[in-house]
């Protein structure tokens, strides 16, 4: 089922994924490792709610594709390096770029809009515009990246 603008469950799942990525970076772990530890904690303690499955999917996806995601973000930063960005902005961009590349049920404008909303909630006054600008540039190349990925896997329209 495609993601829709009013889907607050997905919004909260994205926000939690940003939290996990932020925590993982601060602790020197992968987002997947942090998600796994939270899942174990939820199993052991009744007062700890389990993570939304979409949060776990995003954490695993960002971990699996971290190098490619970071390269893509870095290629579209103008006057910045990934390391100089606020950690929360890095986490937001990583979630959004993963969605742009790998979440086929999430329309690109929704992924960008959700990232901008998260930047408004969690970061500086300048961050929403910055995040929107970077993701707007990334969106220009995502169709080619998705097509190349499908061709490598031997699926989709690139097959011929």
Curated annotation (Swiss-Prot):
One of its GO terms (molecular function) is RNA binding. GO terms for biological process: DNA-templated transcription termination; transcription antitermination. Signal peptide: none annotated. CDD domains: Terminator_NusB. One of its GO terms (cellular component) is cytosol. It comes from the Bacteria. Keywords: RNA-binding, Transcription, Transcription antitermination, Transcription regulation. Belongs to the NusB family. Involved in transcription antitermination. Required for transcription of ribosomal RNA (rRNA) genes. Binds specifically to the boxA antiterminator sequence of the ribosomal RNA (rrn) operons. This is Transcription antitermination protein NusB. It comes from Mycolicibacterium smegmatis (strain ATCC 700084 / mc(2)155). The lineage of its organism: Bacteria, Bacillati, Actinomycetota, Actinomycetes, Mycobacteriales.
């Amino acid at each position: 089922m495609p993601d829709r603008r009013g889907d607050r469950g997905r919004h909260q799942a994205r926000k939690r994924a940003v939290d996990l990525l932020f925590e993982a970076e601060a602790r020197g772990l992968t987002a997947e490792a942090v998600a796994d530890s939270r899942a174990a904690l939820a199993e052991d303690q009744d007062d700890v709610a389990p993570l939304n499955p979409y949060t776990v999917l995003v954490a695993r996806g960002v971990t699996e594709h971290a190098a490619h995601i970071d390269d893509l973000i870095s290629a579209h930063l103008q006057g910045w390096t990934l390391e100089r960005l606020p950690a929360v902005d890095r986490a937001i961009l990583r979630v959004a770029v993963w969605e742009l590349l790998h979440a086929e049920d999430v329309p690109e404008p929704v992924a960008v809009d959700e990232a901008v909303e998260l930047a408004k909630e969690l970061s500086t006054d300048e961050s929403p515009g910055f995040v929107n600008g970077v993701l707007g540039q990334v969106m220009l190349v995502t169709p080619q990246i998705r097509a190349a990925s499908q061709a490598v896997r031997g699926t989709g329209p690139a097959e011929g």
